[in-house]
Swiss-Prot record:
Protein name in the entry: Cytochrome c biogenesis ATP-binding export protein CcmA
Any GO MF annotation of the entry: ATP binding
Subunit details: The complex is composed of two ATP-binding proteins (CcmA) and two transmembrane proteins (CcmB).
Gene: ccmA
GO-annotated cellular components: plasma membrane
UniProt keyword annotation of Cell membrane present: yes
Amino acid sequence: MQNAEAAPALLAAHGLVGRRGGRRPLDLNLRPGQLVHVRGANGSGKTSLLRTLAGLLRPRRGEVRWNGADIHADLPGYYLHMAYLGHDNGCSDALTARENLRYALHVAGAPRAEPELERALRDWGLAAGADAPAARLSQGQGRRLALARVMLSRKRLWLLDEPDAGLDAASLQRLHGMLDAHLAGGGAAVLASHRGGGAWAGCTQTLELDEYAHAEVVGADCLA
């Protein structure tokens, strides 16, 4: 993979101001192999920023671009490359854990990748209850299932809002490994979390939000 700083930006935000306005615009460039860690107090706009980058909200001013093109010019095309995980896990309660992951593989164009599916169930500690409805999963199990879906999505860009919520120490370690592998393969991620910058291996930028879109990039590199 080419040096991240030399590569063109995959995701770029220019002059971004949230719907509340009144704050300094945000500029962001995310390149292959980079992770941006978004931090801020509750109500600072972390979720609004992630939803704006995902195309679910329109900014008051500014634009979000994927590979140089405004995401709102072709949202379906953008969604072919982007996986978004919000506070809701986005899994079907009516389907089993295995069926949820099988659907993720189908959407990713790899419907026959059963070994990959079974490995994900084992790695995330979901194998024992894989054939029970997802509605029966605990909060932590539901979050692990959602992360396994993101991992199997094969999307180049991950937008993760508090992905560590409800995770135990072993699952948190697995999340770190998942992010490391994604970045090493040329992927990119924006992650909102209350954890300190050094907690995320591979983190190349930390975005400190006061109020959206008052943001400041601090530190060129926060590798753990």
